[in-house]
Design a protein with these regions (language model features):
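N-terminal, active-site-proximal structural segment of metallo-dependent hydrolase catalytic domains
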Residues: 1-73, 86-89, 260-262
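Active-site neighborhood of phospho(di)ester-bond hydrolases with catalytic His/Asp-centered motifs
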Residues: 57-60, 81-82, 171-175, 194-198
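His/acidic metal-ligating clusters that form di-metal
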Residues: 126-141, 149-176, 181-186
Length: 262
C-alpha cells in the first residue's frame, strides 16, 4: 500500500446511487501540533470545496473551540464528547466528535473505554440520524497507544457500536492506534467491514482481510485511522486520503452506499 497525497475529488450526488454517503475520519492533532484554529479552518475549507460533502465526519484530538468553529462555518450538527477537561491551549475541553450534515441528529450515548494499563481517558461517542428514512448511527473514537490497552478498548468499541446494529446501519470512525496486521482489531471484523480494506489487494506481508490495497494510510507513513461500516448494510465501499499540512494524520475519506434494509 502506498501513501497518496493527491486531493480526492468525489463525484457529485447526481452521479451516484441514492443513499451513497461520503464519510470523513480525521485526527486533527488539534492541541499537540500547535496549529490552533488553522487546522479547523483548513478542514472546513476542504469540506466546502467538495462536490459531495461528507454526510458523516468523525474527529479525534479535537478542542472544543475548534469544534465550535467548524459548526459556525459548516452546515452540520453533531456532538462533542470531552475526554480531558480544559486541556487545550484556549482552555477548552479536549476530546472526540461526530458531525452530521443534517439537523436530524440526537446523541446515542458515550462509553468510557477500559484502560487496564492506565493512561489517558478514552471514549467512544455516537449519534443517531437517518438517511432517506433509514436509521443510521455514527460513532467516533480514539484509542490508546499502549498495546496493553488496545485489545480491551477495541472490544469495548465493537460492543458499544455493535449494539446499534439491531435497528440501524452503523459507521465507526476513529484513530485506533493499531496497524491493520494487529490481532487486537479482530473484534471489529465480526460485525464491520473497513472501508479501506474493501478491495482484493493486500499490504505486503499481510494476509488479514482489513489489510486492503487502497491508499488509506494516515499518520502519515502507517495506517492507524479507520472507517468501519456495519456488515450487510453497505455496498460499493471504498476509501482514499487527502493531505493535511496542519496535522500529523491524513484525512481518510470513505464512500459507501446503503444497501436495502435488512
Amino acid at each position: 500500500m502506498v501513501l497518496v497525497y493527491a486531493l480526492l475529488r468525489l463525484p457529485a450526488d447526481a452521479d451516484t446511487p441514492p443513499g451513497t454517503l461520503s464519510i470523513l475520519q480525521f485526527n486533527l492533532c488539534g492541541n499537540a501540533c500547535g496549529t490552533r484554529f488553522a487546522v479547523a479552518d483548513d478542514l472546513a475549507a476542504e469540506i466546502t470545496s467538495r462536490g459531495r460533502q461528507p454526510f458523516v465526519v468523525t474527529l479525534n484530538e479535537l478542542c472544543r473551540g475548534q469544534y465550535d468553529r467548524l459548526l459556525a462555518n459548516l452546515p452540520y450538527h453533531g456532538h462533542f464528547e470531552p475526554t480531558i477537561r480544559n486541556r487545550c491551549w484556549d482552555g477548552s475541553d479536549y476530546g472526540v466528535a461526530v458531525l452530521v450534515r443534517s439537523s436530524d441528529v440526537t446523541s446515542a450515548g458515550s462509553a468510557r473505554l477500559p484502560a487496564p494499563a492506565g493512561g489517558e481517558p478514552r471514549t467512544v461517542t455516537c449519534v443517531r440520524t437517518a438517511v432517506q428514512g433509514r436509521p443510521l448511527v455514527a460513532c467516533a473514537t480514539h484509542l490508546d497507544t499502549d498495546p496493553a490497552n488496545t485489545a480491551s478498548q477495541v472490544a469495548a468499541v465493537a460492543e458499544h457500536a455493535g449494539a446499534f446494529r439491531a435497528d440501524a446501519a452503523v459507521v465507526v470512525g476513529g484513530d485506533f492506534n493499531a496497524t491493520p496486521d494487529r490481532p487486537a482489531l479482530d473484534p471489529m471484523d465480526a460485525g464491520f467491514v473497513e472501508a479501506d480494506a474493501a478491495d482484493d489487494a493486500f499490504t505486503g506481508g499481510c494476509s488479514r482481510a482489513r489489510c486492503g490495497g487502497g491508499p488509506g494510510y494516515a499518520h502519515p507513513t502507517r495506517k492507524i485511522d479507520y472507517v468501519f461500516l456495519s456488515r450487510g448494510d453497505f455496498t460499493g465501499v471504498s476509501a482514499l486520503v487527502s493531505s493535511a499540512p496542519h496535522s500529523d494524520h491524513t484525512p481518510l475519506w470513505a464512500t459507501a452506499t446503503l444497501a436495502p434494509a435488512r
